[in-house]
Amino acid sequence: MGEKPLPVRNFKVARDKQDKRNAMISWNPSSDAYGYNIYYGIAPEKLYNCITVNGADHYDFRGLDLGTTYYFAIEALNESGRSALSKVVKQ
């Protein structure tokens, strides 16, 4: 069994200025990862929702509530497990 993937770097969340219900999430891909779990929620310690993205370095998030602050974090995935969770990003 190999090593767990390296943590994700340069994780960014940018809410759309014209439609704040949408956000572009991007990151630098880990060379040893095949996918990523993006966690999000309305409090930094309550990231109860998860989106899994395979083979990409971005995700176009749609459906955020207007006037609500969201918090996001990401981890990389491979056959050996998951990386450490990134720092939480507020948006």
Per-region residue spans from a language model:
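Exposed aromatic-hydrophobic patches
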Residues: 58-64
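Pro/Thr/Ser/Gly-rich low-complexity, intrinsically disordered linker/stalk tracts
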Residues: 1-32, 66-69, 78-91
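Extracellular low-complexity, O-glycosylation-prone stalks/linkers
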Residues: 26-58, 73, 82-88
